From Swiss-Prot:
Transmembrane segments: none
InterPro entries recorded: UPF0250_YbeD-like, YbeD-like_sf
Protein's name in the database: UPF0250 protein Bphyt_0500
Family: Belongs to the UPF0250 family.
Protein backbone atom coordinates (compact mmCIF):
# COMPACT_ATOMS: atom_id res chain seq x y z
CA UNK A 1 0.00 0.00 0.00
CA UNK A 2 1.18 3.50 -0.72
CA UNK A 3 2.00 6.02 1.96
CA UNK A 4 -0.48 8.81 2.70
CA UNK A 5 2.32 11.35 2.20
CA UNK A 6 3.19 10.14 -1.31
CA UNK A 7 2.40 12.73 -3.93
CA UNK A 8 0.52 12.08 -7.16
CA UNK A 9 2.74 14.70 -8.80
CA UNK A 10 6.39 14.77 -9.69
CA UNK A 11 7.89 18.09 -8.68
CA UNK A 12 8.75 20.47 -10.16
CA UNK A 13 5.75 20.66 -12.50
CA UNK A 14 3.40 23.18 -14.06
CA UNK A 15 0.16 23.20 -12.06
CA UNK A 16 -3.02 25.10 -13.03
CA UNK A 17 -5.02 26.70 -10.21
CA UNK A 18 -8.55 27.92 -10.90
CA UNK A 19 -9.77 30.93 -8.92
CA UNK A 20 -13.25 32.48 -8.97
CA UNK A 21 -14.17 35.85 -7.51
CA UNK A 22 -16.52 38.80 -7.91
CA UNK A 23 -15.66 40.83 -10.99
CA UNK A 24 -13.41 43.74 -10.06
CA UNK A 25 -11.00 45.78 -12.22
CA UNK A 26 -8.04 44.72 -10.04
CA UNK A 27 -9.03 41.09 -9.44
CA UNK A 28 -6.49 39.47 -11.79
CA UNK A 29 -3.66 41.79 -10.72
CA UNK A 30 -4.40 41.15 -7.04
CA UNK A 31 -4.48 37.38 -7.47
CA UNK A 32 -1.22 37.38 -9.42
CA UNK A 33 0.37 39.41 -6.60
CA UNK A 34 -0.76 36.80 -4.06
CA UNK A 35 0.53 33.89 -6.16
CA UNK A 36 3.87 35.62 -6.82
CA UNK A 37 4.64 35.34 -3.11
CA UNK A 38 5.11 31.62 -3.79
CA UNK A 39 6.15 31.56 -7.48
CA UNK A 40 7.88 34.71 -8.70
CA UNK A 41 7.84 33.44 -12.31
CA UNK A 42 4.07 33.97 -12.64
CA UNK A 43 3.27 36.66 -15.19
CA UNK A 44 0.44 37.54 -17.59
CA UNK A 45 1.43 34.73 -19.97
CA UNK A 46 0.57 32.20 -17.25
CA UNK A 47 -2.89 33.64 -16.50
CA UNK A 48 -6.14 32.97 -18.36
CA UNK A 49 -9.17 35.18 -17.57
CA UNK A 50 -12.83 34.35 -18.21
CA UNK A 51 -15.81 36.49 -17.18
CA UNK A 52 -19.01 34.71 -16.15
CA UNK A 53 -21.94 34.83 -18.56
CA UNK A 54 -23.66 37.45 -16.39
CA UNK A 55 -20.47 39.42 -15.87
CA UNK A 56 -20.74 39.29 -12.08
CA UNK A 57 -17.81 36.92 -11.57
CA UNK A 58 -14.37 36.39 -13.06
CA UNK A 59 -12.58 33.08 -13.39
CA UNK A 60 -8.81 32.88 -13.54
CA UNK A 61 -6.55 29.97 -14.30
CA UNK A 62 -3.05 30.67 -13.02
CA UNK A 63 -0.40 28.11 -13.96
CA UNK A 64 2.33 27.98 -11.34
CA UNK A 65 5.65 26.17 -11.39
CA UNK A 66 5.05 23.92 -8.40
CA UNK A 67 8.14 22.79 -6.53
CA UNK A 68 6.47 20.92 -3.65
CA UNK A 69 3.17 19.91 -2.10
CA UNK A 70 3.86 22.41 0.70
CA UNK A 71 4.15 25.24 -1.82
CA UNK A 72 0.79 24.30 -3.37
CA UNK A 73 -0.81 24.09 0.08
CA UNK A 74 0.55 27.55 0.93
CA UNK A 75 -0.83 29.01 -2.31
CA UNK A 76 -4.26 27.47 -1.70
CA UNK A 77 -4.34 28.78 1.88
CA UNK A 78 -3.37 32.30 0.78
CA UNK A 79 -5.97 32.34 -1.99
CA UNK A 80 -8.85 30.85 0.01
CA UNK A 81 -8.19 33.36 2.78
CA UNK A 82 -8.24 36.36 0.43
CA UNK A 83 -11.42 38.49 0.62
CA UNK A 84 -11.74 38.82 -3.18
CA UNK A 85 -11.75 35.04 -3.72
CA UNK A 86 -14.93 32.94 -3.64
CA UNK A 87 -13.62 29.53 -4.82
CA UNK A 88 -10.23 27.92 -5.49
CA UNK A 89 -9.91 24.63 -7.39
Amino acid sequence: MSSVNESLFEFPCDFPIKIMGKSHPEFAETIVTVVRQFDNEVDASRVETRPSSGGNYTGLTVTVRATSREQLDDIYRALTGHPMVKVVL
